[in-house]
Design a protein with these regions (language model features):
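RNase H catalytic domain
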Residues: 5-16, 53-123, 127, 132-138
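RNase H-like nuclease fold core
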Residues: 1-46, 50, 57-59, 136
Length: 138
């Protein structure tokens, strides 16, 4: 049994910018939590960043010292959060995420290939796209 929290994140938008949604899959031992949320009109990068932020915000205080790995298929997000890139856009959102990261003792980010055979990444993508589709159909 894995003793770390894995967070798979994805953002989707119809048009860029356009109606956008996020998908998050959190895994810890035998627990699973999924987040699917419409976030209004946004760019794909804002959706990807928002998914990461929501995933980190979903971690309970009692688990802040548990090792956490955030998986993203966004090179943009991975670069901003691991290579200390200076954001030219979305500055406030990036700052909020960087501030959130200071609350965790062991936090890492891993870049994964989008639309690969990783079932949790596929699920995060589905949650993000369904958030856009369901909101647009209301």
């Amino acid at each position: 049994m894995n003793n770390r929290i894995d967070i798979y994140t994805d953002g989707a938008c119809s048009g860029n910018p356009g109606p956008a949604g996020i998908g998050v899959v959190l895994l810890y031992k035998d627990h699973r939590k999924e987040i699917s949320q419409f976030i209004g009109n946004a760019t794909n990068n804002i959706a990807e960043l928002t998914a990461i932020k929501k995933g980190l915000e979903a971690i309970k205080d009692s688990h802040k010292s548990t090792p956490i790995v955030v998986y993203t298929d966004s090179s943009y997000c991975h670069g901003l959060l691991t290579k200390d890139w200076t954001p030219k856009k979305n500055i406030e959102l990036v700052q909020e995420i960087r501030q959130l990261t200071t609350q965790f003792n062991y936090l890492g980010f891993k870049k994964i290939k989008g639309h690969s055979d990783n079932q949790d990444n596929i699920r995060a993508d589905k949650l993000a796209t369904s958030a856009v589709e369901n909101r647009r159909n209301e």
